[in-house]
Design a protein with these regions (language model features):
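C-terminal capping alpha-helices of c-type cytochrome domains
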Residues: 45-69, 161, 301-304
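Short, structured secondary-structure elements
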Residues: 2, 37, 55-58, 70-281, ...
Length: 643
């Protein structure tokens, strides 16, 4: 038996110990795994172990066969979630939106959780769901108009295509660090930009180190870190690698020590790299990978290629573990190491699990989805939430309520209601009159990650984008940043009074609760024949669950009057007036100073606040009651948390 350390060390009657810690070649289990005798070989049935799996077992035994024991009788595990709760959780966690009625019905016919996970991992919306996370981590910070501090190019399109293609993370990092392609039209060269920054590559160095190595070097920008072991020299060596040439430390990137010492007290910080010092490109993280990793670089004369090789080399277990920890934290609500971006501050709560996940990540070809599949299929992920927990249990006995990303909340509201995500172009120069360096068109959004800050130096009403701003206001209330001057790995998830207020009274709330002709709930109300079934379908559509008895009773009472006559006969519907052929007036940078531009924009803002007209296909009184129900359901706390 191998389900306990005692049994493994005891072994069988003839073979001796199945495992001899520190000596894989003396362990009976390894002898059986490597045996050519079909009567002795392990496993006796099925596929034999792969070379990588054998190597993993050999390493584990040679490293001592560490077998941590937990007092299981002191632990209380929550049961697995019910099927519908699991379905909503896994949909939002993988593709950022809840399942449709059709997807729910298909799952109820065949409630195979593994199959659903496999299907979702091939869904193109996987990329949409991860975009906001990597925009934060990599500080993607484009500005529609004139660049300000630490603006980047919009490398979002390369990032989006990389996620759509499920690009292996070692390739992903290599392409990002090469910074080739278009600076202003979506390529990774946009990552190289840090406008109004005296040493752009030092800024990029802090991003790269936290994102892929869990090394926090922000303090080392101007002085040696007082709380970490990293020196300013280390950061500037990394910056020189990213810049492919030596870098001189500017005066603006150093703390004036004469002023710090002026008070007479010994300062907490030290400056060991003087302004004007020239720093050569050099790998500063020998503890993660040695010089032999540089041989993997495609171009040994390109320090960016060398840096990418050093970070992604198989011997660099830190890169694999940091990335695996990020994926784990995204799905589980907390990392095995916290904070995920600063491994000097945090230590693994489960070091063996962390090592195993890192090695699985490498073995799987640095494939994010391969690791996601392992986590999503685990019982730890699929357990029921304990609503009394503020944070997930360190032993993962139960998930805690997990606040969704702002993009997940907004995208889920639009997807579940069936209301089209309709905004202006993310651009203030729609007639393309300005240079690309001073004006960027980021296209027509279909998901909320595609938005960016609408602020600009002019701050004039004519340069407002009212529909984008309405969505951005909701996103901002839930922790989204329109401007990302610095990288972050975890957003502020604390509740605030603005969150319920902006959903219940804001412009987006009007759009979602107004039953217009293009609203999904309007279509549902027109096709259902039974009120009982309609209420069930409404709850499934919006909340991926059936109503409770109390909810069913309350909503039946509210909607029963007039349900039978809710549909207005087509002959009684007044036809809409024919559209005018007058050309719609537009506002762009080229005409925003005209007085009429402000008038046009203010009219657009009023129209945005008003929303689309209500449908004439439903009786007005009954439609108003259904809109009340819709308002109540869309303001339920369930929209903000993973179930």
């Amino acid at each position: 038996r191998l389900d306990s350390l005692a049994d493994a060390l005891k072994g069988g009657k003839s073979d001796g110990a199945a495992i001899e810690p520190g000596k894989a070649d003396h362990s009976a289990m390894m002898a059986r795994i490597l045996s050519d005798d079909e009567d002795e070989v392990m496993p006796p049935k099925g596929k034999p172990l792969t070379k990588d799996e054998i190597a993993l077992l050999t390493t584990w035994i040679n490293e001592g066969a560490n077998w941590p024991e937990i007092q299981a009788d002191h632990l209380t595990l929550t049961p697995l979630t019910d099927d519908l709760t699991f379905l909503r959780r896994v949909y939002i966690d993988t593709i950022g939106v809840p399942p449709s009625l059709e997807e729910i019905a298909a799952f109820q016919k065949n409630p195979d959780r593994k199959a659903v996970i496999d299907t979702l991992l091939t869904d193109a919306r996987w990329a949409d769901n991860w975009m906001g996370y990597w925009q934060d981590v990599l500080a993607e910070n484009p500005n529609m108009l004139n660049p300000t501090l630490n603006n980047t190019g919009p490398f979002r399109w390369w990032l989006y295509e990389s996620l759509q293609d499920n690009k292996p993370m070692d390739f992903f990092v290599t392409e990002l660090l090469r910074m080739k392609g278009s600076e202003r039209q979506g390529g990774p060269a946009g990552f190289a930009i840090a406008s109004q920054n005296d040493v752009p590559m030092a800024a990029k160095g802090t991003i790269v180190s936290t994102a892929f190595l869990g090394v926090e070097m922000k303090c080392a920008r101007c002085h040696d870190s007082p709380t970490h072991k990293w020196l300013q020299q280390d950061l500037f060596e990394l910056a020189a690698m990213l810049g492919t040439k030596e870098i001189a430390v500017p005066k603006t990137s150093s703390v004036p020590m004469d002023k710090i010492h002026a008070g007479g007290r010994k300062p907490l910080i030290q400056v060991t790299l003087q302004p004007g010092t020239k720093v050569q490109p050099k790998w500063p993280f020998d503890e993660f990978a040695d010089e032999s990793a540089a041989k993997l670089a495609e171009d040994a004369n390109d320090s960016r290629d060398v840096l990418a090789a050093m970070i992604t080399a198989p011997q660099n277990e830190r890169f694999a573990q940091v990335t695996a920890n990020r994926i784990w934290a995204r799905f589980m609500g907390r990392g095995i190491v916290e904070p995920v971006e600063d491994w000097e501050k945090g230590k693994p709560t489960h070091p063996e699990l962390m090592k195993w996940l890192g090695r699985e990540f490498v073995r799987g070809g640095y494939d994010m989805k391969n690791l996601a599949r392992i986590i999503l299929n685990s019982q730890a992920y699929q357990r029921s939430t304990d609503s009394t927990l503020k944070l997930p249990s360190p032993l993962y006995t139960s998930p805690a309520p997990r606040r969704l990303y702002a993009e997940q909340i907004v995208d889920s509201l639009f997807a579940a209601t069936g209301k089209p995500f309709h905004t202006e172009e993310v651009c203030l120069d729609i007639d393309n009159q300005r240079d690309l360096k001073n004006s960027i068109n980021m296209g027509k959004p279909h998901r909320s990650w595609m938005l960016t800050s609408t602020s600009n130096e002019r701050d004039r009403p004519s340069l407002a984008l009212p529909r984008i701003q309405a969505v951005a206001d909701v996103l901002s209330a839930f922790g989204w940043r329109g401007s990302r001057q610095d990288p972050i790995s975890k957003r502020d998830a604390d509740p605030n009074v603005l969150q319920p207020a902006i959903l219940s009274n804001g412009t987006v709330g009007v759009w979602l609760t107004r039953l217009s002709d293009d609203h999904g709930v309007t279509a549902l109300a027109l096709q259902e024949e039974s009120l009982d079934h309609f209420i069930d379908q409404l709850f499934l559509k919006l909340l991926t669950r059936k109503p409770t008895e109390q909810e069913k009773k309350a909503y039946t009472q509210h909607l029963s009057e007039g349900f039978a006559s809710r549909i207005v006969p087509a002959s009684d519907i007044r036809p809409l007036p024919a559209p005018t052929r007058e050309r719609e007036k537009y506002v762009s940078w080229s005409n925003h100073l005209d007085g009429e531009a402000t008038t046009v924009r203010m009219a657009q803002e009023a129209a945005a606040r008003k929303g689309e007209p209500p449908t004439a296909k439903l009786n007005t009184e009954w439609r108003n009651r259904l809109e009340d129900v819709l308002w109540a359901l869309l303001n339920a706390p369930e929209w903000a948390f993973s179930p």
